Amino acid sequence: MSRLAKRHPDLLSCNFNQDYSCIAVGHKKGYTILNCDPFGKVHSNNDQGATGIVEMLFCTSLVALVGAAENQPSNSPRKLQIVNTKRQSTICELIFPTSVLAVKMNRKRLIVVLENEIYIYDISTMKLLHTIETGPNPNAVCALSSSSERSYLAYPSPVPSASSTPLSSSAIPAPPPAPTTGDVLLFDTISLTALNVIQAHKTPIAALALNSTGTMLATASDKGTVVRVFSVPDAKKLWQFRRGSSSARIFSINFNLMSTLLAVSSDTSTIHIYRLASSRKGGKDADDASTEEARSPTPSETPLASSPPLAGGKLDSHSAASSLRRRSYHLGKSFVGGVGGYLPKSVSEMWEPQRDFAFIKLRGNHGRTVVAMSATVPQVMVISSEGLFQAYNIDLENGGECSLMKEFALLGSEDFGNGSNGI
């Protein structure tokens, strides 16, 4: 998540770029771009004004900015600016009907997330291609693959209960329901089609992450005790990991660039790193593994290939997901009815989700955190709402507790002086 708790008096937001080589920081006077290794400032602008969202496009000079000043039209949270930091110029400005909650980019698409809508733009022309009506998503939970070829978008699917029936054509359409289920809708931003609805959890989705190649999706619910990894786009469950037995608020999930490790941070003092390459895969066994939130083994991973084409450049997530849910529900119900009576309740406990491979113990009151893994050295990087960047060494052979190697402040007194260096 890019928006962090405001524990540092000047920090408004902080996030890694797509390959975890840089950090984008928004603060009360503007924004700063930092290099991770070696750590250091690359660019700063202290004349921008309060900046709530800063999103980079890899290590290029293209940066998306969203203001954080409700009473200043030039720095409104409804205003998105695309700027070139090297030329110190504004490429375009867009105004939205409500506050922009998140911005995601890859080399083909720019995604703008509002509470009830997602806008998809062609990043080369900034032409609006598509609008998705999502229903309430106040935490802007979504993920965009950094891959240009598999430019998939994942977000919570506002799906009604499986037993609900569609409205008749004469009925007054109801607003999209809140995402009270743990379903995730997978959308192809290149073909502009819905691909799949994944029944990931039983409670609402709290965090999502797609790997760099767009082939895996990691999910966590608002209960925060289990993390699942699915293949994309066919939605086969690959792994299931136990974060802990008590509930926790998940702050961030990130794959490493090789998709062999998965890091998860939460409101607890422990950051978990899971190994993907050697863990026992989920498949059939892990479907019932979680005592927290396992779902019935319905064939929920049915592609939306048979769905009608989208009309008017707009996707109603409610309708698309409802169609899929009705098909999968009836088939799944008959399957469960046939075999459910033969399975003892304790069977679900036989397939305990995998525990972490390595972990980090954070010191003191760390606030909100974002975790990522370096692509160049065996290190786990953590940025926090305290305004700190920390790098921990990880033993890739044996795992265990990671050791703190270096720590830097994201903001210093020089951030509120003059001077700016382009990327």
Swiss-Prot record:
UniProt feature, compositional bias: Basic and acidic residues: 282-295
Topology versus the membrane: Peripheral membrane protein
GO cellular component assignments: endosome membrane; phagophore assembly site membrane; vacuolar membrane
Predominant cellular place of this UniProt entry's protein: membrane
Subcellular localization(s) per the UniProt record: Preautophagosomal structure membrane; Vacuole membrane; Endosome membrane
SMART domains linked: WD40
One Pfam match: PROPPIN
Domain notes: The N-terminus might form a beta-propeller domain involved in specific binding to phosphatidylinositol 3,5-bisphosphate (PIP2), leading to the association of the protein to the membrane. The L/FRRG motif is essential for the cytoplasm to vacuole transport (Cvt) pathway, for the recruitment of ATG8 and ATG16 to the PAS in nutrient-rich medium, and for its recruitment to and dissociation from the PAS under starvation conditions.
Protein name, UniProt field: Autophagy-related protein 18
Gene encoding the protein: ATG18
Family designation: Belongs to the WD repeat PROPPIN family.
Quaternary organization: Component of the PI(3,5)P2 regulatory complex.
Alphabetical UniProt keywords: Autophagy, Endosome, Membrane, Protein transport, Repeat, Transport, Vacuole, WD repeat
Its job: The PI(3,5)P2 regulatory complex regulates both the synthesis and turnover of phosphatidylinositol 3,5-bisphosphate (PtdIns(3,5)P2). Necessary for proper vacuole morphology. Plays an important role in osmotically-induced vacuole fragmentation. Required for cytoplasm to vacuole transport (Cvt) vesicle formation, pexophagy and starvation-induced autophagy. Involved in correct ATG9 trafficking to the pre-autophagosomal structure. Might also be involved in premeiotic DNA replication.
Region span, Disordered: 281-317
UniProt short sequence motif L/FRRG motif, positions renumbered to this chain: 241-245
One of the GO biological process terms: autophagy
WD repeat positions: 200-240, 245-284
